[in-house]
Regions:
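N-terminal membrane topogenic signal
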Residues: 3-21
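Interfacial helix-start motif at the membrane-water boundary
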Residues: 54-73
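Membrane-interface loop-to-helix entry segments
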Residues: 67-70, 125-138, 202
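Perimembrane loop-to-helix junctions flanking transmembrane segments
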Residues: 41-60
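Interfacial segments of alpha-helical transmembrane regions
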Residues: 88-103, 154-162
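Non-cytosolic membrane-interface motifs at loop->transmembrane helix junctions
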Residues: 93-95, 119-132, 156-157, 187-191, ...
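Membrane-interface transmembrane-helix boundary segments in multi-pass integral membrane proteins
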Residues: 9-14, 65, 179-215
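Alpha-helical transmembrane segments of multi-pass membrane proteins
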Residues: 23-46
């Protein structure tokens, strides 16, 4: 019998690896909340917004508005679910996991190419930065490639998965206009205007669909390979 995509089973090594990924991603987010609770926010040099968040609950509840936090949260939660029970996941899980994977890869690319500067960070913050912007963006797609589960990426799920970052963008821009704060300089509406940020948004959204399409293509190729091997 040729195994279907839904019968793909993740072994102990895959479950353990996803447990480590969940620990890293969710642990890093917990550390971000701690920093928000103990430190005030800062404004990047040249930014057009003026809002500062004081240390404590204000800056703590602001942390989930960062794309990095959201990406690591999506990957961390889906990795935890795979570590606990890797089989029987449906369409919603597949779309959410794909969204997390693609968003986290984008996090690594955009932050390290466009947003990273030469500021010397304290050790704790530097470790957190490395985990959220380098380690998890590499580890998450690597574990997907090694352990699957396969057959969960479809055209409909690619489209559905994009609703999450689009919703994040809408909330970020509406909230930014209300409270005069934006998480990144590439979304600095007061300085760049909506036309200016549209260049970045369009490029990143295009990158999202390119990466999601790549995940889809690779997934289909691997499913075919498994079926051919099983039929031989």
């Amino acid at each position: 019998m040729i195994p279907s995509a839904g019968r793909h089973r993740m072994g102990a090594a895959g479950r353990a690896a996803h447990g480590v990924l969940a620990l890293l991603a969710l642990g890093a987010n917990a550390a971000s909340l701690f920093i928000g609770a103990t430190e005030s926010s800062t404004i990047p040099e040249g930014a057009g917004w003026t809002r500062l968040w004081a240390a404590g609950w204000q800056n703590l509840v602001n942390q989930p508005l960062f794309f990095t936090f959201m990406s690591n949260f999506l990957v961390g939660i889906t990795a935890l679910l795979l570590a606990l029970r890797p089989s029987g996941r449906g369409a919603v899980f597949g779309a959410v996991r794909l969204s997390g994977l693609v968003c986290l890869v984008i996090t690594g690319v955009v932050f390290n190419v466009l947003l990273r500067d030469d500021t010397l960070l304290p050790l704790f913050t530097a470790v957190l930065d490395a985990v959220q912007h380098v380690i998890t963006p590499i580890l998450a797609p690597l574990l997907w490639l090694l352990f699957g589960p396969r057959g969960q990426v479809t055209g409909r799920r690619v489209l559905a998965s994009a609703l999450i970052p689009v919703a994040w963008l809408v909330v970020t821009l509406v909230r930014g206009a209300l409270v005069d704060w934006y998480p990144y300089v590439i979304l600095d509406v007061p300085t760049l205007g909506y036309a200016g940020i549209a260049v970045y948004v369009g490029a990143i959204l295009g990158l999202y669909f390119v990466l999601a399409g790549l995940f889809w293509w690779v997934d289909n190729r691997l499913v075919r390979r498994v079926r051919v091997a099983a039929a031989a």
